[in-house]
Regions:
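Active-site capping/gating segments
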Residues: 90, 163-199
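A short glycine-rich, Lys/Arg-flanked "PGG" loop and its adjoining helix->strand segment in the class I
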Residues: 143-155
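Conserved SAM/SAH cofactor-binding pocket of Class I
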Residues: 54-128, 132-133
Length: 199
């Protein structure tokens, strides 16, 4: 998938596409030193990483301004959402080397984002509008990890794979949140999982 095709699917400007490219250039440079993503995904980075992450923006609740991205790793989805604009993003990454990479991208691209080099469980409540995560943990474990960040108006947007239905089997036994899944734009087996408190 080409940069222009991804840009069209995400409905972003030429300037945003150029920032995505600058981000991927930094990713490839750092990937030689530290393992940020699977090497096999680099050739398809526009689809596997940029589109996969950026599709979450279409699922923001109204008036979303503040994102908390947990287990940010190489910055997917958090940095992609910061590049797309309209929100500020707090990224949580406990691995120091990955946190340095994230800080470098934020600084060089001038992004509205902040990196927290610590574990999510040790953080004060930041009152985010949306909490995001990709490839971090199962749904029960994720909700346990972010428990101190949740509040009644907070929504969760998680990028999940084919096993998501199994993960949601006993949702009602440990959470009052309501789950909705949407097909992923980036792959046939992936889904966007939305968790919200009932109104």
């Amino acid at each position: 998938m080409t940069p222009d095709q991804v840009g069209e699917l995400l409905n972003v400007s030429r300037e945003t596409i150029e920032k995505f490219q600058a981000y991927l250039t930094l990713l490839e440079k750092w990937q030689r030193r530290i393992n940020l993503v699977s090497n096999s995904t680099l050739a398809e980075a526009w689809q596997r990483h940029i589109l996969d992450s950026g599709q979450l923006a279409a699922h923001y609740p109204p008036q979303t301004k503040h994102i908390l991205d947990v287990g940010s790793g190489a910055g997917f989805p958090g940095l992609v959402l910061a590049i797309m604009g309209g929100v500020t993003v707090d990224l949580v990454e406990s691995d120091q080397r990955k946190a340095v990479f994230l800080s470098t991208v934020i600084r060089e691209l001038g992004l509205p984002a902040k990196i927290h080099n610590q574990r999510i469980e040790t953080m004060p409540n930041l009152r985010p509008d949306v909490i995001t995560a990709r490839a971090l943990a199962t749904v029960p474990k994720l909700l346990n990890l972010i428990e101190t960040q949740l509040h009644p108006d907070c929504a969760c947007l998680f990028l999940k794979g084919a096993s998501v239905e199994d993960e949601l089997t006993n949702l009602q036994s440990y959470s009052t949140m309501v789950a909705t899944t949407y097909p992923s734009l980036s792959g046939s087996t992936g889904v966007v999982l939305e968790l919200k408190n009932p109104r």
